[in-house]
Amino acid sequence: AIYAEARQLLDWNARNPFCAQCGQPTLSVNGGFKRTCPPKDLARTNSKSSSGVTNALSNVPEPPTDETARPPCATRKGVSNLSFPRTDPTVIMAVVNHAGDKILLGRSKRFPPYWYSTLAGFAEPAESIEEAVRREVYEESGILVGRVVIHSTQPWPYPANLMIGAVGQSIPEGEVIDLGNDPELEDAKWYSFEEVREALRVGTSGIGEEAGKDWKEGGLRLPPHTAIANQIITSVVCNGFVSGVPKM
């Protein structure tokens, strides 16, 4: 958690050195949790300070002069999301077929051979999590999802994602896979719960890691236990997460 917070704050501060409102350089304050657009150019003020302590660090604020004053900026008039770290909501979902005995998994070209995971994507402005799940699943796989249940969340600071895990269930007439809507996935398949349980036992690993010693060539591979994708897959195929909620 400490690493994730630090990673996200460092990345955000490095990417946002200028004010999005007026374009002037900003200052990192509050331990990196905020960037502020000051009313005067502190760099030029510091260079003209005759004391041993610069004006930027002085306890007595100096009024802006004509030489150091900056143009008016809306971010100084109140709380504004222009000055705070961004967090991008991202949906990641295990999709179960209507019969409740298969799970949809996909893979991109960068994945190792036989390595599959849950589908995922960014939520769009003014979109609910449930709507984002249905849209992303349809765009990437052509599957139509009805019921959506939010499962859990995981921060993912690469650079600023909040992974919102969900479980969706397809409608009977919308279970044919079609990758033609979006070229993001190389492949998507329906896997039986039995096959996925076996992969959870012997075939979990990170993308750049070797599969477990009991994994056999050609078998399904899945994300590691530390990933939210693994957690929602496990909840579905091993812990009966879907069966406890009535189907739509």
Features from the language model and the residues they span:
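Short cysteine-rich clusters marking metal-coordination/redox-active sites
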Residues: C19-C22, C37
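Short loop/turn microsegments at loop-to-beta-strand junctions
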Residues: T90-V91, I129, E186
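Nudix hydrolase/Nudix homology domain
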Residues: A1-F18, L27-V29, F111-Y116, P159, ...
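Active-site-adjacent beta-strand/loop module that shapes the phosphate/pyrophosphate-binding cleft
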Residues: Q154-I177
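Conserved aromatic-histidine-acidic binding/catalytic patches
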Residues: R7-L10, N81, G121, P125
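The catalytic Nudix box helix
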Residues: S117-H151, A166, G174
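N-terminal strand-loop-strand
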Residues: S28-G31, R35, D41-S117, L144-V145, ...
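Short Gly/Pro-enriched turn/cap motifs at secondary-structure boundaries
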Residues: N81-P85, W156, G180
